[in-house]
């Protein structure tokens, strides 16, 4: 079960530029279900501020969306919260090995879930529903 205590509460998502240290823990976990591309380790702070633990304690945050690492666009569930990267959208940068695009998030507050996908010029890729697509049978 991913969100047993969250049914009926408000659904929140968080947007940030830099990934939390938990991104590396989640992406390297053998039990994790990960969708998307991970070409580099998250450039997360070495000092863990406890922000993820605080969001978990609050109980309403369903997803955290970040950027910064241009060669990542994955989504992975960690302790009941989806940790996902956007997609590099364009402009001048030091590096970028993925096609430009964007992450779209569609909330469904009635179902206490959301869909997210990467939108490219050529169409949609990596469409997932959270939490349904991250539950192990």
Tell where the protein language model's regions lie, with residue ranges:
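Single conserved hydrophobic/aromatic residue that forms the stacking wall/gate
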Residues: 1-8, 12-13
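Hydrophobic/aromatic beta-strand patches that form the interior of the parallel beta-sheet core
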Residues: 13, 63-65, 84
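A cross-domain feature marking catalytic cores of carbohydrate-active enzymes
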Residues: 16-18, 118
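Active-site environment of divalent metal-dependent phosphoester hydrolases
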Residues: 18-24, 61-77, 91-93
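Flexible internal linker/loop segments at domain or repeat junctions
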Residues: 21-50
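N-terminal short leaders/motifs
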Residues: 37-39, 55-63, 67
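Short amphipathic alpha-helix initiation/capping segments at coil-to-helix junctions
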Residues: 44-45, 67, 94-98
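Binuclear metal-dependent phosphoesterase catalytic core
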Residues: 50-58, 72-137
């Amino acid at each position: 079960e991913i969100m047993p205590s969250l049914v009926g509460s408000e659904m929140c998502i968080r947007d940030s530029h830099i990934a939390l240290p938990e991104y590396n823990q989640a992406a390297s976990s053998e039990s994790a279900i990960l969708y998307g591309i991970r070409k580099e380790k998250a450039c997360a702070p070495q000092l863990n501020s406890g922000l993820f633990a605080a969001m978990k304690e609050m109980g309403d945050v369903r997803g955290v969306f970040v950027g910064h690492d241009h060669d990542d666009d994955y989504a992975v569930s960690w302790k009941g919260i989806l940790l996902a990267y956007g997609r590099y959208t364009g402009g001048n940068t030091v590096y970028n090995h993925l096609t430009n695009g964007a992450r779209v998030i569609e909330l469904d507050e009635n179902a206490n879930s959301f869909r997210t996908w990467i939108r490219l010029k050529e169409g949609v890729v990596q469409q997932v529903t959270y939490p349904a697509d991250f539950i192990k049978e």
